């Protein structure tokens, strides 16, 4: 259970960071 929870937490963090980077890149391109 612990490994599954940590895996999902890592996956969620990776998705959040990726989406934040994509939004930042799109904003920079719009400027």
UniProtKB/Swiss-Prot annotation:
Membrane spanning stretches: 4-24
A GO MF label: electron transporter, transferring electrons within cytochrome b6/f complex of photosystem II activity
SUPFAM superfamilies (UniProt xref): PetL subunit of the cytochrome b6f complex (SSF103436)
Annotated disulfide bonds: none
Coiled coil: none
Primary location: plastid
GO CC annotation terms, alphabetical: chloroplast thylakoid membrane; cytochrome b6f complex
Source superkingdom: Eukaryota
HAMAP family, sorted: Cytb6_f_PetL (MF_00433)
Assembly with partners or alone: The 4 large subunits of the cytochrome b6-f complex are cytochrome b6, subunit IV (17 kDa polypeptide, PetD), cytochrome f and the Rieske protein, while the 4 small subunits are PetG, PetL, PetM and PetN. The complex functions as a dimer.
Its biological purpose: Component of the cytochrome b6-f complex, which mediates electron transfer between photosystem II (PSII) and photosystem I (PSI), cyclic electron flow around PSI, and state transitions. PetL is important for photoautotrophic growth as well as for electron transfer efficiency and stability of the cytochrome b6-f complex.
Family according to the record: Belongs to the PetL family.
Name of the featured protein: Cytochrome b6-f complex subunit 6
Organism: Magnolia stellata (Star magnolia)
């Amino acid at each position: 259970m612990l490994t599954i929870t940590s895996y999902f937490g890592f996956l969620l963090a990776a998705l959040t960071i990726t989406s934040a980077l994509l939004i930042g890149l799109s904003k920079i391109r719009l400027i």
